[in-house]
Swiss-Prot record:
Pathway: Cofactor biosynthesis; adenosylcobalamin biosynthesis; cob(II)yrinate a,c-diamide from sirohydrochlorin (anaerobic route): step 6/10
This protein's name: Cobalt-precorrin-5B C(1)-methyltransferase
A single GO molecular function term of this UniProt record: cobalt-precorrin-5B C1-methyltransferase activity
Gene name per UniProt: cbiD
Family matches, as NCBIfam families: cbiD (TIGR00312)
InterPro entries: CbiD, CbiD_sf
Length: 369
């Protein structure tokens, strides 16, 4: 398969593919004294990617190439980001017949500070597959006895990274160079799901036996303060509860507390394990069903079903003085659902409102003091 990104508008290419393209064009310039407007690189599946080069310059034995990140129709925070690659060509000892490639990060590329990732602590966040792709494509340009030193940098990478998961993963100072195939596929959750998994690895490496699964940043904020736990113990799952819980089980996790805002967590009580509103939204119906077990009031049921937000329903239940009873029931049902689907894991559930106040809870796993 060949994808020509000079004309392609649906697919995009990864930060890893940007780094490979920049490195190849820079080394090609050093070897052939010719600037390339585009490069043809191979990914690890031997698929050809044709990627445009924005700019290229040289100074003696060093060349500098610039590639602009393109995400296709799967627009993300790194779309149109500039990636700079510097390549220096060096001679080895006269008797050497080796071909060497060294890869480093520069400004705007993150540095790993936590165990559990694919990269050693203290190293630049350039994942193994992009490193392998760089080596695969550059090695053919080298003669025996030559070494290419590759350094990748990203203007504003530090600022961009603050809008990604990198700070939570312990990757500081910039973004990561990622990608297994070099191709960004549109409207696919697969890459995003995979990006969430290192959180579990880091928690396991740090020896945490009870993990706290939350929907996102708000859940993380209140879980830290309410439960008095470390951030590395908290796993943000976004909407992918089924996927993340399944992977946690595969990795040997035995005790999980589900913690989060009522609007997300009540869906789990209904057996909904992808909580994105485009996939499913039965919050009002679930809350109505559990309220009906405590109160036979048709007008109340209508109010709940017609409410615009979960917070509005919380206010209605508080006025009727059944708020905690309803959410304790829902918490219990969440635990029952999870235990049924993932029988090798002990579950607990804590549901909070928009301000982090506990509405309901059910403990089967280890308690938090």
């Amino acid at each position: 398969m060949t994808i020509d990104f000079r004309t392609e508008t649906t697919f995009g290419y990864t930060t890893g593919a940007c780094a490979v393209s920049g490195a190849y064009s820079a080394l090609y310039f050093l070897k052939n004294n010719k600037k390339l407007d585009f490069v043809e690189i191979l990914n690890l599946k031997n698929e050809t990617l044709i990627i445009p080069i924005q700019n290229i310059e040289r100074s003696e034995n060093t060349a500098f190439a610039t590639v602009k990140k393109f995400s296709g129709k799967d627009i993300d925070i790194t779309n149109n980001m500039t990636i700079n690659v510097e390549v220096t060509l060096q001679k080895l000892d006269n008797n050497s017949n080796l071909k060497l490639i060294e890869i480093f990060g520069g400004n705007g590329v993150g540095i790993v500070t936590k165990r559990g990732l694919q990269i050693d602590v203290g190293d630049y966040a350039i994942n193994p597959k992009p490193r392998e792709m760089i080596e695969k494509n550059l090695i053919s340009l080298l003669n025996d006895g030559e070494k290419a030193v590759v350094r990748i940098s990203i203007p504003n990478g530090d600022e961009i990274s603050k809008k990604t998961l990198n700070p939570k993963l312990g990757i500081i100072g910039g973004i990561s160079i990622l990608g297994t195939t070099g191709i960004v596929r549109p409207m696919s959750n697969d890459a995003y799901k995979e990006s969430l998994l290192p959180q579990i690895d880091i928690a396991i490496q740090n020896g945490f036996e009870n993990l706290v699964f939350v929907p996102g940043n708000i859940g993380t904020k209140y879980a830290k303060s309410v439960l008095n736990i470390e951030e590395d113990q908290i796993i943000e799952v976004s909407n992918f509860w089924g996927f993340m819980l399944e992977k946690a089980g595969e990795k040997g996790v035995k005790d999980i507390t589900v913690f989060g805002h009522a609007g997300k967590i009540v869906k789990l009580a209904g057996g909904i394990f992808d909580t994105h509103s485009k996939v499913s939204d039965a919050r009002n119906e679930i809350l109505c069903a559990y309220t009906s077990t405590l109160c036979n009031n048709q007008e109340l049921m209508k109010k709940i079903l017609q409410s615009n937000t979960t917070e509005e329903i919380i206010e209605i239940l508080a006025e009727k003085d059944i708020l905690n009873e309803v959410f304790n029931l829902i918490s219990k049902r969440v635990v029952e659902r999870l235990c049924l689907r993932f029988p090798n894991i002990k579950f607990s559930c804590i549901i909070v409102d928009i301000n982090g106040k506990i509405l309901g809870k059910c403990f089967l796993g280890d308690r938090f003091d």
